[in-house]
């Protein structure tokens, strides 16, 4: 089946696509892959800054080049990762292999590419990438909608602040300390 408004998995990508289109930059598969790349790159840079003896030879001037991998991330890059994933059957491992290819293109990074993803699990990457998408969407493109929703939720939390609920372990406190932090 070809993807269109009628064959989308949910109405969000189907009939509501016009209203949610701006969210694709933050919550699409492309965006998730990009955020995984960003997390892996920033983690590698952090390892270099510790400093680990094995990474002491990494020139700090290369950090901007590394960051440009995710800053200039393209659909072709995402497709390359999907192609790697079709062989590895592992989404995060495909990101790791993609970054190793990028290190090869940079030259002089052969001794360091085994430190991509060093000491991490796939969940470490996913559990950082997914919240990053929410954070960036709030900070960049969806402020109006987010402020509206947060304002409504804040009102609900105020109205229900004395209501107890089974399994409810957190208190929202006073108005303004509610579910969302809105600007």
Predicted regions and their residues:
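A helix-coil-helix interface module used to build multimeric assemblies
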Residues: 1-183
């Amino acid at each position: 089946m070809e993807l269109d408004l009628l064959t989308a998995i949910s109405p969000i990508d189907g009939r509501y696509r016009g209203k949610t289109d701006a969210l694709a930059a933050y919550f699409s598969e492309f965006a998730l892959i990009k955020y995984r790349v960003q997390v892996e790159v920033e983690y590698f840079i952090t390892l270099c800054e510790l400093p680990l003896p094995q990474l002491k030879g990494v020139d700090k001037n290369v950090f901007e080049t590394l960051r440009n991998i995710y800053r200039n991330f393209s659909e072709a890059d995402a497709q390359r990762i999907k192609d790697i994933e079709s062989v590895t059957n592992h989404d995060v491992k495909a990101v790791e292999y993609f970054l190793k290819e990028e290190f090869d293109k940079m030259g002089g990074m052969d001794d360091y590419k085994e430190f991509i993803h060093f000491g991490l699990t796939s969940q470490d990457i996913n559990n950082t990438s997914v919240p990053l998408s929410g954070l960036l969407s709030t900070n960049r493109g969806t402020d109006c909608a987010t402020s509206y929703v947060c304002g409504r939720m804040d009102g609900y939390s105020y109205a229900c602040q004395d209501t107890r609920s089974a399994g409810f372990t957190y208190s929202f406190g006073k108005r303004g300390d509610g579910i969302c932090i809105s600007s």
